[in-house]
Design a protein with these regions (language model features):
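Secondary-structure "cap/kink" motif recognition
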Residues: 1-184
Length: 184
């Protein structure tokens, strides 16, 4: 009976040791942004010296300074459903000297800034491409030194070209010459 009790105690101890080791490998994730899209009035995307601003005018979204393109709503939906919900997972560095390695410094990274209705900053982050995992990327909040791996790659959803965000409006319908002439 004592041997059976000893074996049971050993199994319980091994179970708890195994659980504690597995917890070290568990990745905790949290939101990069804690912003709701209905609070966003404008967002800016900047890569190198190229930037684009997308702003809300009443209930519609427009590319700032570009009145020839109509915004593609699927791009705005991507911002709401993918960018604002991206998760940061494991921290890969807290050393600012390694920002270039992870492409999250000001010159290599892609910066997105969200603004509210009174032009206050709601959130600002720099995303960098991962050279080893194409389906994920790195992120650093602008005022922080920690660099995190994200749960998915959002860089392909953030572009600075106006034609990525908008498309030319369809041409007006042609009026046939016979339609404009009426005989009485």
């Amino acid at each position: 009976m004592k041997i059976l009790l000893g074996v049971l105690l050993l199994i319980i101890i091994l179970f708890f040791v195994s659980q504690s080791r597995q917890k070290r490998h568990f990745t905790q994730s949290s939101d990069v942004f804690t912003i709701s899209m209905d609070k966003v009035n404008r967002f800016d995307i900047q890569k190198d010296s190229i930037s684009i601003s997308i702003e809300r005018i009443d209930t519609t979204w427009q590319i700032a300074g570009n009145d020839s393109l109509l915004i593609q709503m699927n791009r705005i939906n991507d911002v709401e459903q993918k960018i604002l919900t991206v998760q940061r997972e494991s921290m890969v560095s807290n050393n600012s000297k390694k920002w270039k390695t992870f492409n999250v410094d000001d010159s290599l990274g892609l910066k997105i800034t969200f603004y509210g209705y009174t032009n206050e900053k709601l959130g600002e982050a720099i995303f960098g491409r991962s050279s080893s995992e194409w389906q994920r990327c790195y992120v650093r909040m602008v005022d922080e030194s920690e660099v995190y791996m994200t749960n998915e790659n959002v860089l392909n959803r953030l572009q600075t070209q106006p034609t990525f965000w908008g498309s030319k409006p369809p041409p007006p319908p042609k009026i046939e010459a016979s339609d404009s002439l009426q005989t009485f």
